[in-house]
Amino acid sequence: MNNKIGFTLLFLFGFVLGLILLTNDARAQQPASGSKPAQPSATAQNPEGPYTITSSIEFGVRGIAIDGNADIYRSQLNYTPGFRIFDASLFMQSKDNDAPVFDSLMISSFGWGNDPNRHLRVNAEKTKAYRFDANYRRFDYFNSLTNIALGQHRSNTEYRQGDFDLTILPQNQRAKFYLGYSLNRNSGPAVSTIRFNGDEYPAAYPVRAASDEYRVGADARVSVFDISFMQGWRFFKDDTEYLITVPHPGNNPTNTAKINDFFRSAPTRGETPFTRLSVHTLINRRLDFTGRYIYTSGTTRYTFFQNGTGTDSSNNKVNSDIITQNGGSKRPYGMGDVAATFFVTDRFRISETFRVNNFRINGADLLSEVLLRSRVTAGGETTLPPVLTNTLAFRTIKYRRFLNLIEADLDISRWLSVHAGYRYTDRHVEVGFDDISIGTPAGPEVETFDNRTNTFIFGFKAKPVKIWSLYFDLERGESDNVFTRVDNYDFTNVRVRSILRPNRTLSFNASVVTKDNANPSVTEDNRAFGVNVKGRVFTSSVDWSPSQKWSASGGYTHSRVTSDAEIILAFSGSPSTPGQSRYFSRDNFFFVNGFCQLSSRAQLFAGYRFHKDPGQGNRLSTQKLLIGSFKYESQAPEAKFVLKVNKNVDWIAGYQYVAYQEQFPKGDFYRAHLPYTSLRISFGRPE
């Protein structure tokens, strides 16, 4: 109730303030009787300073009223009530490109205050000297959804990301230089689960992760070659911990395991230097050649410490269970490719690309565990023999992949062009692993895997009539996956797109995308054990802009995904039996937007969005067939009114409504009302 009263008062305050400003502006436009016409000021006629400046700021309040599950609302939208700066911008342009520090400066931002997404952008340039580009973003990530994890996987963290790039001599065609820096931070409270003594327990999970990247590079023109070089260094760290400070019986109430306290820490450090070199040239306007080489060498190190006390599943008292671990890995990676395009004629082109990927991952760690337990009986407490574990583990992955792609493009006429190609890959993978218990002989094992894929590509662009464009793309073949060594994916991807423009104000867009993906595999007992996924996306939209005073657009998208996986069903007391798991997604999305210039001072924007996924429909699971889907429905109408109070001030009032409903017997829902009002103050904009 307090939230509803609060946002209502704030909304009325903004409305009244806008009317007051409108009244004052109307009075100011009425000349006093007998007064002389105002003379133009000298400042307006002869503006001083080296820059032309345009700026604006929009500030106001947002109200929130939520009915239903507030955690789902925060996990999806996370807007909060109160004051905020919706957006702000500043643009400075030198009048003669001869300003002392910069010739142009643009600063823009939105969302600062209480919005979950905030962005700041800065662009500055001094002609022929430098160009600076900066982007800084902050995201509030809240996740607290009802799921099979009993609501014990939650987070309320903040992401901070930034990219800062400086280009020296940006207009110089012979040489230019680059400096860059990027940051990524994630921190905040979270809850996760841990396994201990045969049961599962919720644990505090404070997230602390960060990465920094530094870059330096140059572009140069040497004779007929364009050369580009980049050297970078990326550093990463993660200091996330798991904490349990109060006793907990565990999620399984049928066993005797419980925990008294628990601590886990695994600080991780990583660094990845990377190098990129590329060369490009055009020979006699017939042969376009590009060569590129990338090399990285990533290193990761970590230390692990864990200790917990409680009771295990055998009703033994766990006095201490200390696990320490130290390890690291290294991943040198190299990728080189060369590509050439030969212009046989003005209408016919042949392209050839050859690429080599090669990497190796070497890692090892040493694990030590000391488990101290005792048994409490009627006769007292008996100390059990300690359990000591010392294991040394090694892992090695070697990966090499060749790729060759040949393509041809033919422009048959102004109305028709055709594209065809063939892609071939050859992959070799070696996996080595060795787990050594201290005091026992080693038994290293190595697995080797080789495979090849073939893919055919075809497409065309047609213009049957002047107002109609038609696009078609087809890919059919096999695809490998570096982390899946069972078999190739058999896939067929088709895309058709149509654009119809009867005139300059009206356009119709329609497209169809189909993706058939099969991952066949056979286990050692000759049992089929694969996955088939079929996806279909139908999209259509209409855009109509008959004049600058009003416009409308709308569209409909239907996305359907069906997956069919062979699985093994294991029931307590019964032998494992083969089964199937099928998942259905049938998402329908509709939207409509409109704009109307009500008068020279007033504008109205309105829109409506609707989502519905009926999922599996009336299909039901059987003993050997598991059927799943996620049924939901959501709608979001919104409207915004903009009133130009005077040359420098706009009053804005808007309203958004979001309704979300999960279509389950006990499905969660929420309904959110989000009114807002704001003032936009501008300087330097035209009448």
What is each stretch, according to the model?
Residues 26-28:
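Boundary at the C-terminal end of the N-terminal hydrophobic targeting segment
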Residues 30-49, 53, 63-687:
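Gram-negative and organellar
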Residues 1-12:
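Bacterial N-terminal signal peptides that target proteins for export
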Residues 10-20:
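Bacterial N-terminal signal peptides
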